[in-house]
Amino acid sequence: DSXVPEXFDARKXXPN
């Protein structure tokens, strides 16, 4: 997802 830091999944809503 754009603008989302690497390792962060916006779909999960939490850090991966």
Curated annotation (Swiss-Prot):
The keyword Secreted does not apply. One of its GO terms (molecular function) is cysteine-type peptidase activity. Keywords: Hydrolase, Protease, Thiol protease. It comes from the Eukaryota. It is an enzyme of class 3 (hydrolase). Its EC number is 3.4.22.-. GO terms for biological process: proteolysis. Involved in the dissociation of the larval fat body on metamorphosis. Belongs to the peptidase C1 family. This is 29 kDa hemocyte proteinase. It comes from Sarcophaga peregrina (Flesh fly). The lineage of its organism: Eukaryota, Metazoa, Ecdysozoa, Arthropoda, Hexapoda.
